[in-house]
């Protein structure tokens, strides 16, 4: 059993594992995987290819490709295994790894990190998807 609240939208190929609960107005991007007992606060956006660990409580937006764990949720990595399984090239995975480090490991503000992502986003549509999922966040991103 999984609960999908009112006016919520799930993308294609999503997996919502047992006892996952989405509050109202949640948006889950394509290929996202929400592990068992994941809770998602109303109005949150879960980006495409994102992954949540078991028992995660998500209260802010999760950018595309990001892996979150914990209660409250914290970003831990990117969903590299999911990318490999879906045929992403080693080059794209390497570039996304660098972009994750820009946002989550360099101590930059979100605004400054987005500026740093502009160049690789112009060259790789996957990075642009990651960048746009941060740029469009209304609740703030899980960090």
Where do the protein language model's features map onto the residues?
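Structural signal for interior beta-strand "rungs" in well-ordered beta-sheet cores
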Residues: 2-74
């Amino acid at each position: 059993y999984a609960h999908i609240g009112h006016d919520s939208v799930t993308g294609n190929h999503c997996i919502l594992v047992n006892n996952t609960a989405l509050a109202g107005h949640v948006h889950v991007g394509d290929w996202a995987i929400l592990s068992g007992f994941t809770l998602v606060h109303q109005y949150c956006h879960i980006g495409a290819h994102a992954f949540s660990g078991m028992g995660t409580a998500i209260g802010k937006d999760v950018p595309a490709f990001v892996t979150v764990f914990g209660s409250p949720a914290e970003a831990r990595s990117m969903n590299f295994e999911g990318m490999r399984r879906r045929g992403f090239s080693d080059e794209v995975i390497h570039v996304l790894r660098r972009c994750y480090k820009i946002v989550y490991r360099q101590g930059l503000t979100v605004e400054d990190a987005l500026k740093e992502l502009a160049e690789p986003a112009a060259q790789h549509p996957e990075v642009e998807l990651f960048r746009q999922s941060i740029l469009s966040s209304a609740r703030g991103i899980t960090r």
